[in-house]
Amino acid sequence: MLVKIYPENPNPREIKKITQIIEDGGVVIYPTDTIYGIGCDISQPKAVARLAKIQGLDMDKAYFSFIFNDLSQISEYTKPMSNAAFKLLKRNVPGPFTFIFEANNNIPKLFKTRRKTVGIRVPDNNIIRSIVSELGRPLLSSSVHDVEDEVAEYITDPELIHERYGNVVDAVIDGGYGDNQPSTVIDCITDEFEIIREGKGEIK
């Protein structure tokens, strides 16, 4: 299913439709402020396993991030962060960044693999943030493209994304052409903040 949603003014009815698909255990593809993302409800293990299978990822090694609507729920999933880290977030979100923090015990047991960290995203995109706000909890997210592959045209054009993934996901949101750059990733485990992947956007 390909669903057109305008990022400037997302239709609440369409937002509710996509949110219901996610709540029912669906996997969806959506625009962000960088590359299109693919994600599901973090609280549904079957959906998470399906997402990993679609992406061809080993859950022990897979890298996922959590998409939030704002900063209000982040502390529910990370260990306490320093004032410096919180100020870094406030200066740069919403924006094209992934911030790596230590995960706390509230992360679903499914993610208690070798990874003890969590990637935090608050994209500057009204569509996905409206969906997460309606859902009431963060969305487990991965980029549509394989990080080892070059960014191809199919992952910037939602119609081509639908042609490629439409038979394995429950919905693809057409929010216009996506970007061809991934997010910039910042390690915030300590206050010696380190950029571990250069992507779209400059840290303030």
Q: Could you say what each language-model-derived stretch is?
A:
Residues 1-204:
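Active-site-adjacent structural elements in enzyme catalytic cores
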